[in-house]
């Protein structure tokens, strides 16, 4: 078996070269997985606090694919819409307290 650096996957055919039996393949329906990381920097004079949490949102949407609205543009709009909703929710939680 070749090291990962010597295996390539074509963006056009979605096939590995050389062929790889257990290579990851995207869903036929298409999906987007995103993780947002927030860094908090401690300031002097601040109290001590432990904060943790998890936020999961899921959206499903049917879109048409055409030359003027390709698949990647539809995914981009979906990601931006979801990001705006999450930012709004966090803003309401933060300023609502």
Curated annotation (Swiss-Prot):
Which coarse location class applies to the principal site listed for this UniProt protein? cytoplasm
Q: Does the keyword Cytoplasm apply?
A: yes
According to the UniProt record, one GO cellular component term is: sarcomere
Would you say which domain of life the source belongs to? Eukaryota
Which Pfam family name is an example for this entry? F_actin_cap_B
Task: Please provide the record's keywords in A-Z order.
Answer: Acetylation, Actin capping, Actin-binding, Cytoplasm, Cytoskeleton
Q: What is this protein called?
A: F-actin-capping protein subunit beta
Instruction: Give the species.
Output: Mesocricetus auratus (Golden hamster)
């Amino acid at each position: 078996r070749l090291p990962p650096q010597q295996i390539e996957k074509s963006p056009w055919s979605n096939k590995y070269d050389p062929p790889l039996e257990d290579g990851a393949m995207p869903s036929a329906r298409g999906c987007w997985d995103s993780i947002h990381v927030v860094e908090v920097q401690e300031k002097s004079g601040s109290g001590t606090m432990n904060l943790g949490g998890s936020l999961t949102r899921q959206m499903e949407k049917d879109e048409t694919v055409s030359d003027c609205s390709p698949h990647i543009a539809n995914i981009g709009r979906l990601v931006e819409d979801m990001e705006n909703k999450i930012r709004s929710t966090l803003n309401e939680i933060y300023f609502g307290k």
